[in-house]
């Protein structure tokens, strides 16, 4: 949604630059989607994020908005720009249609208004206000705290804030088309050497064996391959970028937990997982007795029914390092698609 809003805003006016705030990890991938925009690292609060973005602003005026207000119109943006000389901060406001209770008493709704975004401010004054270190719920409150003048323009009911899952359904009434329906496929491959030991972990199942696995984490190659397949399908890079093997934080890590984090990341970019297929390459141990337990573990991590997950195995006919028992490997394929918000709650099968 951030990308849709950014491109809509870019089409509304000749902005000097459009700055998008995100986490450090998100920005790396956001740039792949839209290199034409500027990016600022987010803070622990909206206010900290705003300060970080303002550090990149050198124009006399700055307009800021919540990325969750996807319905911001060109008319609202133009109203703000036309009024920029009237005050230090121009704010869109809507009248209250409902009765209001405040501290147990009925308030006069005619004296109240609903403030929204975008808000257009004098850059220098907004920066100065935020340096005070106090907490403000929006830009206008910060400007007012240093004596700045606030003026209002008519708000836009369509610029509501997407707060709850059900709010997504309102986008249909604004003419937003459902997301791309194409399916995206990813492929993953991983290998590990054996070492002295008495078990291996495959798809979260601990299996007795006459050897152990040489690895930074728990050496669960099928899960590492599946993570790569999911990241690849979403064009987010590979497992090493998210869980580097030189980071002590992941020393001995439970790969099933890494898979759950991988799923969280992929879903955070708007995707839902369709299915997964894993092939384990090894001479020993025998996989068949453990396939259903593996399948159950993977399905739970992906939030899929087990019939959307497949586990299979093959030997290398005594050829290569796998065939001679030096190690083992795994190949995984995953299919994903964009979550279709027009149909409501995400489908977990």
Task: Show which residues each predicted segment covers.
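Conserved active-site beta-strand element of glycosyltransferases/polysaccharide synthases
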Residues: 149-155, 160-163
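C-terminal edge-of-domain segments
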Residues: 324-344
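Short, conserved loop-to-beta-strand elements that form functional interface hotspots
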Residues: 277-286, 290-322
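Glycine- and Gly-Pro-enriched alpha-helical subdomains that act as flexible
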Residues: 229-272
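Conserved core of the sugar-phosphate nucleotidyltransferase
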Residues: 71-153
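Conserved N-terminal catalytic core of the sugar/cofactor nucleotidyltransferase
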Residues: 2-58
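Short aromatic/hydrophobic "clamp" motif used to bind/position activated sugar donors
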Residues: 60-62
């Amino acid at each position: 949604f951030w990308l849709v809003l950014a491109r809509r805003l870019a089409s509304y006016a000749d902005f000097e630059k459009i700055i998008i705030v995100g986490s450090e990890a998100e920005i790396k991938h956001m740039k792949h989607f839209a290199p034409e925009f500027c990016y600022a690292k987010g803070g622990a609060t909206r206010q900290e994020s705003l300060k970080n973005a303002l550090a990149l602003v050198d124009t006399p005026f700055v307009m800021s908005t919540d990325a969750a207000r996807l319905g911001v119109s060109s008319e609202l943006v133009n109203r703000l720009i036309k009024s920029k000389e009237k005050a230090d901060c121009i704010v869109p406001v809507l009248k209250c249609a409902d009765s209001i209770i405040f501290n147990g008493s009925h308030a006069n709704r005619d004296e109240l208004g609903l403030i929204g975004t975008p808000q257009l401010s004098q850059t220098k004054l907004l920066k100065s206000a935020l340096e005070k270190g106090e907490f403000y719920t929006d830009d206008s409150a910060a400007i007012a705290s240093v004596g700045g003048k606030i003026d209002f323009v008519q708000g836009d009911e369509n610029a509501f804030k997407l707060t709850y899952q059900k709010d997504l359904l309102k986008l249909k009434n604004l003419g937003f088309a459902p997301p791309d329906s194409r399916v995206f496929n990813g492929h993953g491959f991983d290998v590990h050497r054996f070492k002295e030991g008495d078990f291996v972990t495959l798809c979260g199942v601990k299996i007795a064996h006459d050897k152990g696995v040489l690895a930074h984490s728990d050496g669960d190659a099928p899960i590492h391959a599946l993570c790569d397949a999911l990241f690849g399908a979403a064009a987010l890079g590979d497992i090493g970028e998210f869980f580097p093997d030189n980071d002590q934080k992941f020393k001995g890590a439970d790969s099933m937990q890494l898979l759950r984090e991988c799923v969280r990341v992929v879903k955070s970019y708007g995707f839902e997982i369709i299915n997964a297929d894993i092939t384990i390459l090894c001479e020993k141990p025998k996989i068949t007795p453990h396939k259903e337990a593996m399948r159950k573990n993977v399905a739970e991590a992906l939030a899929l029914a087990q019939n959307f997950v497949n586990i299979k195995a093959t030997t290398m006919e005594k050829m290569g390092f796998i065939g001679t028992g030096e190690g083992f490997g795994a190949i995984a394929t995953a299919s994903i698609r964009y979550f279709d918000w027009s149909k409501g709650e995400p489908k977990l099968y």
